[in-house]
Amino acid sequence: MEEHYYVSIDIGSSSVKTIVGEKFHNGINVIGTGQTYTSGIKNGLIDDFDIARQAIKDTIKKASIASGVDIKEVFLKLPIIGTEVYDESNEIDFYEDTEINGSHIEKVLEGIREKNDVQETEVINVFPIRFIVDKENEVSDPKELIARHSLKVEAGVIAIQKSILINMIKCVEACGVDVLDVYSDAYNYGSILTATEKELGACVIDIGEDVTQVAFYERGELVDADSIEMAGRDITDDIAQGLNTSYETAEKVKHQYGHAFYDSASDQDIFTVEQVDSDETVQYTQKDLSDFIEARVEEIFFEVFDVLQDLGLTKVNGGFIVTGGSANLLGVKELLSDMVSEKVRIHTPSQMGIRKPEFSSAISTISSSIAFDELLDYVTINYHDSEETEEDVIDVKDKDNESKLGGFDWFKRKTNKKDTHENEVESTDEEIYQSEDNHQEHKQNHEHVQDKDKDKEESKFKKLMKSLFE
């Protein structure tokens, strides 16, 4: 049986990440990754086309070497910036008894895309909430059911500004690969939540380099999403100003000594930094450093609370899930736990080689790709035999972990701080993960699911450009 590999690209403000993965039982097996740091992206968008393109190209090459896969087609993750989330429905009719298949599902979903009448936006994701067969039978997956009259879908829709979409896809396809489809972070975050969290109402907070993204899920579905232009870079700027040192030095000490919860920071960890206006070096403690970090991270969380209040939310019973590169900072969980009465957890992907919060978007893009391929019946998944341990595989389906319930006292400002120390996952500089599988074996066995069709489907970019000029 053919092996089907999924390649995702995450274009972030500080780095570009690529993951090559495959479906493995109910999870994803990571074959290889690549990561390249870049200055060509600002606030999650293309700032310098040439620099960004080179970073994407380098990252694809690293992932290709690590996995032994010749990468030709990719799935692209898009940021929440410039997006709108809303609900829509569509219905198709049948004039005889019909067994529903993936083509019918694709048709009814495509009808929702065609209903978008805002010229400056493009619908990028339509995620089914429920299907209704013959106006009465509500189901989550109608494949193989017999419909006598109709198939209706009630779905959530994510649309993005066309200029953002075009430039992101153009930059990726300039690297010699085709973008098969795109997935918004707003939708992707659903794969990092447990079923209980999604049902009760959970808030995902992705703190990146330039942007903090927020998505709220409730009753199993995405409710809304937004972004805040305040994130890790602002933390570093505050450190540089507070310690009177360079940005580069501030970034270094943030990663080595940073702590986001003042009461748990140490006054015994001492470091020295050079001053920007003299040749002198000055000593500081981790507690001194934490004073600047805590203030900014706290401000980011208050901005998140404002977003939730704008949505009319007074409870987040499923808790807060923090991820993204800045979630690596020690004390982030402790600080947020001190500000809210609901549970807080840091999300880190479970697979070997990507066990860092900054890989959450890239791996969840693969989860989204697999979910839609299975819904539309595009692929028959090969469940590989493997010696990999369970901890190396992240669930594609929602996990039914028990979440902490309890009253939600809205968002508390800081009161009595705890003295407990929360060890977060530390970031490393690893750029390439190479699996134990032999590279040559992957090259010989690899054949992408779309490559078997001689009449290859046009890329997302080519389709979009055609539509603009029709």
UniProtKB/Swiss-Prot annotation:
Signal peptide: none
Top-level taxon: Bacteria
SUPFAM superfamilies: Actin-like ATPase domain
Annotated membrane topology: Peripheral membrane protein
Keywords: Cell cycle, Cell division, Cell membrane, Membrane
GO process annotations (BP): FtsZ-dependent cytokinesis
Bias-annotated ranges (Acidic residues): 425-434
Alphabetical list of Pfam families matching this protein: FtsA, SHS2_FTSA
Location in or out of the cell: Cell membrane
Cell membrane as UniProt keyword: yes
Disordered, as annotated region: 416-470
Family membership noted in the UniProt record: Belongs to the FtsA/MreB family.
NCBIfam families listed in its UniProt record: ftsA
The name this protein goes by in its record: Cell division protein FtsA
Gene this protein is translated from: ftsA
